[in-house]
Amino acid sequence: QHWSYGLRPGGKRNAERLGDSFQEMDKEVDQLAEPQHLECTVHWPRSPLRDLRGVLESLIEEE
């Protein structure tokens, strides 16, 4: 039972809204079934450790 779907704690349900709640859940399930285009919006600042790692790797490759 989940309160956001009009269900109440203790098993009590609002009978008038119960049909609406199930329709809402059905729509959400349909949306989840559709493929989602996700794209990363987090841009990490350059890490000094990553830069150092790159320098060390290039030095090792030169040897």
From Swiss-Prot:
One of its GO terms (cellular component) is extracellular space. Belongs to the GnRH family. The record marks 3-8, 10-11 as: Cleavage. Stimulates the secretion of gonadotropins; it stimulates the secretion of both luteinizing and follicle-stimulating hormones. One of its GO terms (molecular function) is gonadotropin hormone-releasing hormone activity. It is found in: Secreted. This is Progonadoliberin-1. Disulfide bonds: none annotated.
